[in-house]
């Protein structure tokens, strides 16, 4: 649970479109603004017009706020949600809704409709709060606000009694402005004996929070934990500054001066009300700062700040004069000293790279007071003028990429997201690409360029900038052992408008309609959940930061990635009751994969992490012909995937990077090792040399800390990919040592050299198996229990086939057995002993493979299998045939010409191998008629082996 911090809390207004639907984009933009300044969001309270919202709208607001916080890496910032209803039952339902939607704490106000009856018997008020707190899945904050609850003003004794009666009461908000009441409450609950007798259910200490910020300074001295006030909506940094000054005894003078100023501002904010606050927010933040273009573009303001100008023309005419221009209104208001300083806070200009827009002093709360003071809260919901309601929407329409935070967005420093750190993945209207050591751009020259405090270069070419990832600063430039930094280019998408080849625009424009024709967003959302449960634990190449909070926001995802996720999850539809109707008329997986490939093709000019993720999931598709090998497309797509990875710099280790969020570092490492594993296994299956050499990357091996922010919290997620990536490095060494063009020439005919070369690899394989956790090991049929699937079978099969790849190389010198004895007559015994050791090891591997297949259950066959599992079954089957050819006794002609050859035969091994093949054929036939056959896992191996050995075994 996220702790309930001390400090400043901002009760968010609720923004509406003209049709009274919630403006989610405006809400999320505002959440990022106030939270990035260091305040805690409070939603669905009095300021949020919760009285006008239904339950679904309240949940939507909470989900949207959580998404906004996560998008700017404020994962540790909690959400407080209003949950006061007209009855105990309704309030409990709202508490449960808030928990489901992602809130961390709820705030409950007494119901005011029957206030007279409640005031006549205050025990009913106590029971109201205690019953709610005991049933709520979230800690409860008591909300004492007499003005909106029928005059119910709970005294300190009643509040303390409620605290004593339920451990789930975590705080109180006092909007009665009674410092004495706060003092009496904290005088009791802060005592050690009280805390020992009445412990809280959460680890966070009890919080008493001011309902106004105008008495913050005096209240802190008696135990106040902060303030929930509407003023931080417009001036959050000033309010946070006041809080910080109040914590420092040496800053009492500055704290008093700022408290006085903020008290005046808070008084005006109370007068203008909710509608006034929302209109003021729009006036200051809802319109871009005017350009300074006396002679046409570019803008002089942007040029002087070494920034790219995104305005192509001067500001258009206003439909209506601003309030600050109505001098008869503004002139009647007096501005206190320092007011201009208070209102010079800035807001992110979403989607733009210019400086944040400064708030004009003429648009102060004082100027808004007289015109707006008579506007009621209900007016702010439904009765604003068209210009006003449109303005609320325009605050968020500045975002060119909803759901993604821009590089100019400033963040609050946390342990997981230091300030000024931004993602390379989410750059509105631009893409990033890795700049290598050769090519037309010289990184040594770039290292001498001027960079701002975000390590972004001052643009010299319109639409192109550079970003240093790991440069510790100019000090390093003077050292002797200076190494060039890792540099990425950032290019506007507009520069790619004429890039060719590209698809017909109509094809891509019809992408979303094609997807929604196959399934609705709700079904797609359920498929994502299935993916999270059944695929992500074994292939965690996605981050939770890439997935929206609800089905309504799926169109913010890259279409290629969304279709790939849905197609990959499609085989698991029957495990979601809500998708049973889809079983009657399921969407075409082929159509989904075609749409995915179409979108990937469009993205190849400017690929991203999502492009690579879609490529890797496209590799996981089920075969179209169960008995034939994949076409060359799989290998071609693998090469494309590696090229995409290198383009986005995935092959470089992020350990020293300081310019991206921690979650993106973790995702990059997981994604790299997912790509690495798939490339090695597809190369093995295709019999091709790997595209990826050990000198071509420096990404460190996965650690437990890297397996975070995944879509699943399964224990398999922590271990499967880690052991898979380690196993894949062993396979890579085997491929390089035995299967490169040059290595084949050295090892094919030299048994002793091959044995020496294989010895350390066999040791590594044994160590890998010995260190495998019990949950990843194959188990007997009797041990399988529960109602879930086990997708670890493909990992252990990969281990067996890695062993097969090594033994297959050792069998090559024995291909002409027993003719090899004729050639090597001088040391036949030594040759035979070496050959027998290889054959014995191969038989043990066959035994392990066959028993593995026999032990597999429906819960394992029906689970997720890596795409290379299908050729792995076939490779293991072909290995048995190869071994059979070697151990088959010599024919009668050879025996008669050289009777001593019988001495060096493998008759016993031949008999044993035949038995294992018989058992394998039976197990494969059975599995091919079940889940394994539906997925084509064993069909290819079965037809290969049957074709090779005929009916003679």
UniProtKB/Swiss-Prot annotation:
Checking CDD domains in the record gives: DHDPS-like, fungal_TF_MHR, GAL4
Localization recorded for this chain is:
Nucleus
Q: Which InterPro entries match?
A: Aldolase_TIM (IPR013785), Carb_Metab_Trans_Reg (IPR050797), DapA-like (IPR002220), Transcription_factor_dom_fun (IPR007219), Zn2Cys6_DnaBD (IPR001138)
* Annotated GO CC locations: nucleus
Q: Which Pfam families match?
A: DHDPS, Fungal_trans
Would the keyword Transcription turn up in this protein's UniProt record? yes
Q: Which Gene3D superfamilies match?
A: Aldolase class I (3.20.20.70)
Name the residue ranges with Low complexity bias.
374-408
Report keywords, A-Z.
Answer: DNA-binding, Nucleus, Transcription, Transcription regulation
Q: Which GO terms describe its molecular function?
A: DNA binding; DNA-binding transcription factor activity, RNA polymerase II-specific; lyase activity; zinc ion binding
Q: Where is this region: Disordered?
A: 371-418
Please provide the Gene Ontology terms (biological process) for this protein. Answer: DNA-templated transcription; nitrogen catabolite activation of transcription from RNA polymerase II promoter
Q: Which coarse location class describes where this protein primarily resides?
A: nucleus
Q: What does this protein do?
A: Transcriptional regulator; part of the gene cluster that mediates the biosynthesis of communesins, a prominent class of indole alkaloids with great potential as pharmaceuticals.
Q: What is this protein identified as?
A: Communesin biosynthesis cluster-specific transcription factor cnsN
| Annotated source species | Penicillium expansum (Blue mold rot fungus)
